[in-house]
Structure formats: structure tokens, C-alpha cells
Amino acid sequence: MPEMPEVETVRRTLIPLIKGKTIEKVILWYPKIVATDHEKFLSELPGKKIIDIDRYAKYLLIRLSDNLTIVSHLRMEGKYHLTTSDAPKDKHDHVEFIFTDGTALRYNDVRKFGRMQLILTGTERQTTGIGKLGYEPNSSEFTSEYLVNGLKRKKKNIKNTLLDQSVVAGLGNIYVDEVLWRTKIHPLSQANKIPAEKVMELHDQINQIITEAIKLQGTTVHSFLNANGQVGGFQSKLQVYGHVGEPCPVCGTKFEKIKVNGRGTTFCPHCQVIYK
């Protein structure tokens, strides 16, 4: 699933491609991608101009004229690409926004898990899943105190806690494994047993790794591509994720992999301490 750095990369690459364009027509080849009223989606978007593209956590917020916003969640494999309106359709293209200049933005999703909603701008927290999210890394609200206090109430393991979007918005499996290895915290550590000073270190590393990943335009492990069809660059910097059986760069112990609530989790059994 695209995590915060990947969605931010999509946002940054989409802006120069579609900002300022006016929608002429919308085609829904797979209507279930749109979670709100399909007919309204088709009838209200023609004539609307792309004003800007924002993001919160893993959600893209495509700002339109007349105070409307398309909220888009890519889920597992959603992608956007710009083409011409007469270009052959790929079998995994499910939504098309045709612009007045003859170009078209297509949403492609192999698994069909992605979702879009058409809402009034400013109602994101009231009408979408954004309202259930915690603060995202590198925001002014995501302080070390916020994370320390948040973990005090969590008795589950730290891996699941960091994947909980109501605690930290935007993190996924890849970056959680990397952060826990950097901070030498075992993924099965009980969240509220981790010392405050260690949680502060965790906070700093979350911010750091997200910054690094955004700078390198995200991580492509399976299928992630930005809006220009390019892969990310952070996969070459991964130290633990995808390296099961290889030696830890710090101690030489072979990385091990376990399942934590169904999620593959790679860690160093020597460096990473279990807090219980």
C-alpha cells in the first residue's frame, strides 16, 4: 500500500500535470471506486477546474472550483497517469477525467480497492475517514509529547500501534519496520512499556525516515509508480524491510521475519529490545 511518502510523491508529480485544467467529462468504468453518489460524481464534475492538490496522511485531496474536493485513497495499488482522451484503455483503468484540452487523467487500480469521494471542501473530517486519523509525521501537532502520551494508553504491541492510523497517520508496514530497527525496539514490545526517552527517539526517527523517503520520491517494492510512471528511490535505502535472512548492518545477526497480526515483520533479534 502506498504510504505517506508515496502519496506525497503522487501529489507532487500530479500538480504540474493537471493543475489549472478544466474537466469536460468523467467516465466511470468501475463505479464502485466512487464511494459517494455516482450520478452526482458524473454530473457535478464537468466544468470544474483543478485548483490544487493537497494531502493528509494517505489521502489525496484534489481541490476543485466551486468549493468541491475529490478525496482519493489509493489503497493497495491505485495509480494516476495522464494520457490523451483517445488513448487505448488499459484493463485496469477504472476512472477517467477528460479535460477540455484533450488530455485525460486515468485512475488505474489492479485490485480495485481504491476509493474516491466528492465532498464540499473543508468537510474532510466530517465526511471521510480523515476524521478518524491521528496527526501525521512532521506536522506541528505531531510532537514527542503527543506520541509519549498516546503510547501510554496502548497495551498492544508497538508494531500494531504504529500501524494504527488513529495514533500516527500515514505510516505503513515498510516504514514501521525501518523505524523500529533504527530505534532498536522489538516489534512485539508492549507500547506503554517503552521508556519515554525511547519514545522520543522513536518520534524523531519517524520524522526523519519520512523526510528521507519523500526526498527520494517514495519506495517501490512491488508496483508503486508516481504520476509520471517512475519508480521511487528509497527502496535502495531500506535496511531491514525485505532483507530477511541477511546480516544486520549493525551486529551481523541474521534478520528474522514473523507475522504480527498478519503483517510480515522483519527485525534483528539481537539489536531490537523487547519491552514488556
From Swiss-Prot:
Q: Where is the active site?
A: 2 (schiff-base intermediate with dna), 3 (proton donor), 58 (proton donor), 263 (proton donor)
Record-linked Gene3D superfamilies: 1.10.8.50, MutM-like, N-terminal (3.20.190.10)
Q: Which UniProt keywords apply?
A: DNA damage, DNA repair, DNA-binding, Glycosidase, Hydrolase, Lyase, Metal-binding, Multifunctional enzyme, Zinc, Zinc-finger
**What is the organism of origin for this protein?**
Lactobacillus helveticus (strain DPC 4571)
Which metal ions or organic cofactors does this protein require, according to UniProt?
A: Zn(2+)
What is the protein name for this chain?
Answer: Formamidopyrimidine-DNA glycosylase
Tell me the InterPro entries matching this sequence. Answer: DNA_glyclase/AP_lyase_DNA-bd (IPR015886), Formamido-pyr_DNA_Glyclase (IPR020629), FPG_cat (IPR012319), MutM-like_N-ter (IPR035937), Ribosomal_uS13-like_H2TH (IPR010979), Znf_DNA_glyclase/AP_lyase (IPR000214), Znf_FPG/IleRS (IPR010663)
Cofactor notes: Binds 1 zinc ion per subunit.
Assigned protein family: Belongs to the FPG family.
Name the SUPFAM superfamilies for this protein. Answer: Glucocorticoid receptor-like (DNA-binding domain), N-terminal domain of MutM-like DNA repair proteins, S13-like H2TH domain
Give the GO biological process terms.
base-excision repair
EC number from the UniProt entry: 3.2.2.23, 4.2.99.18
Describe the reaction catalysed, as an equation: Hydrolysis of DNA containing ring-opened 7-methylguanine residues, releasing 2,6-diamino-4-hydroxy-5-(N-methyl)formamidopyrimidine; 2'-deoxyribonucleotide-(2'-deoxyribose 5'-phosphate)-2'-deoxyribonucleotide-DNA = a 3'-end 2'-deoxyribonucleotide-(2,3-dehydro-2,3-deoxyribose 5'-phosphate)-DNA + a 5'-end 5'-phospho-2'-deoxyribonucleoside-DNA + H(+)
Residues that hold DNA according to the record: 92, 111, 154
Which molecular function terms from Gene Ontology are attached? 8-oxo-7,8-dihydroguanine DNA N-glycosylase activity; class I DNA-(apurinic or apyrimidinic site) endonuclease activity; damaged DNA binding; zinc ion binding
Tell me, how does this one assemble? Monomer.
**The encoding gene:** mutM
- Read off the PROSITE patterns from this record: FPG_CAT, ZF_FPG_2
What is this protein's function?
Involved in base excision repair of DNA damaged by oxidation or by mutagenic agents. Acts as a DNA glycosylase that recognizes and removes damaged bases. Has a preference for oxidized purines, such as 7,8-dihydro-8-oxoguanine (8-oxoG). Has AP (apurinic/apyrimidinic) lyase activity and introduces nicks in the DNA strand. Cleaves the DNA backbone by beta-delta elimination to generate a single-strand break at the site of the removed base with both 3'- and 5'-phosphates.
Task: List residue spans of FPG-type Zn fingers.
Answer: 239-273
Disulphide bridges: none
Name the CDD domains on file.
Answer: EcFpg-like_N
